[in-house]
Amino acid sequence: VGRLYVRKFNYSYARSGTLFEGRFKTCVVQEDQYLLACLRYIELNPVRAGMVSDPGDYRWSSYRAHAFGVKAQLWSPQRLYLELADSCRRRQQTWRAMTAEAVNGELLAKIRHCSNTGLVLGTEAFREQVQRLRN
């Protein structure tokens, strides 16, 4: 991102430094439980980092859209999120309950490892399928 934009952004939000820390990290994620776990992981990151005590307090999170239906310009719900319940209210309640539970420690470690290394996050069969497509 251009230096002028970063300077303007920092001035606008009374901050300093680079806009993004480190390299952008990405990995292929299988839907099913892995995608929802990643969404929970991402939305709870500001809480784990001690930036906020409630995920809804973090301005840049999609948590308020998922948990309370707050409209967000750059947000569109994932199919799996929509399948959590048949009504908006129940989906939001389900999401709040899901995010109130900690992400399983083993799964949390897998998410971190795959996102840091660019490995595929999913079942063995899914990882093999992605590997075949990449070759």
Predicted feature descriptions by range:
Residues G2-N135:
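Short Pro-Cys-Gly-centered "Cys-loop" motif that presents a nucleophilic cysteine in a tight turn
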